[in-house]
From Swiss-Prot:
Cellular component terms (Gene Ontology): Golgi apparatus; membrane; mitochondrion
Domain comment in the entry: N-terminal region is required for phagocytosis of Gram negative bacterium.
Protein name as it appears in the record: Protein C1orf43 homolog
Function: General regulator of phagocytosis. Required to uptake Gram negative bacterium by macrophages.
GO biological process: phagocytosis
Length: 189
């Protein structure tokens, strides 16, 4: 009986040593990883700094140009004029499955509209996304260069734009035609 208890205690000692060394290795790996992570965060990046061993003027020019990259915004044309999906849209009788095409056409219609953005020193491409929404809100809330513009027209255009861009409901041919009509009416005002 005594030899059996010695055997169990020996197995226990080996298991405790194995588990202890496993915990030690895992802690070592974790601590090393955290130290490397914080060391990488403290520098400019995980690699050699930009412009390493370059003259000071060149480093400053590189930093200026890299900071400009964050300000670049580009929204591509969603549907080309010769897109095959537009041909399907015109030939198909069931229009409900092509709602996304009307959304894309509505967002592309801003670029091709005749709204005189240039009178305020803006360009149609600079009025994409949130800027176009804020432009419409400015038209609605302040005195505008468009003297005869009704607030209901701007509200219709704003609702159509938000539905086309962010809405989850149906945006079909009827909604697109309403939006296009409001956009052309604003352009002629």
């Amino acid at each position: 009986m005594a030899s059996g208890s010695n055997w169990l205690s020996g197995v226990n000692v080996v298991l405790v040593m194995a588990y202890g060394s496993l915990v030690f290795v895992l802690l070592f790996i974790f601590v090393k990883r955290q130290i490397m992570r914080f060391a990488m965060k403290s520098r400019r990046g995980p690699h050699v700094p930009v412009g390493h061993n370059a003259p000071k003027d060149l480093k400053e020019e590189i930093d200026i140009r890299l900071s400009r990259v964050q300000d670049i915004k580009y929204e591509p044309q969603l549907l080309a004029d010769d897109d095959a999906r537009l041909l399907q849209l015109e030939t198909q009788g069931n229009q409900s499955c092509y709602n996304y095409l009307y959304r894309m056409k509505a967002l592309d219609a801003i670029r091709t509209s005749e709204i005189p953005f240039h009178s305020e020193g803006r360009h149609p491409r600079s009025l994409m996304g949130k800027n176009f929404r804020s432009y419409l809100l400015d038209l609605r809330n302040t005195s505008t260069p468009f003297k005869g513009v009704r607030k209901a027209l701007i509200d219709t255009l704003l609702d159509g734009y938000e539905t086309a861009r962010y809405g989850t409901g149906v945006f079909g041919q009827n909604e697109y035609l309403r939006y296009q009509e409001a956009l052309s009416e604003l352009a002629t005002a």
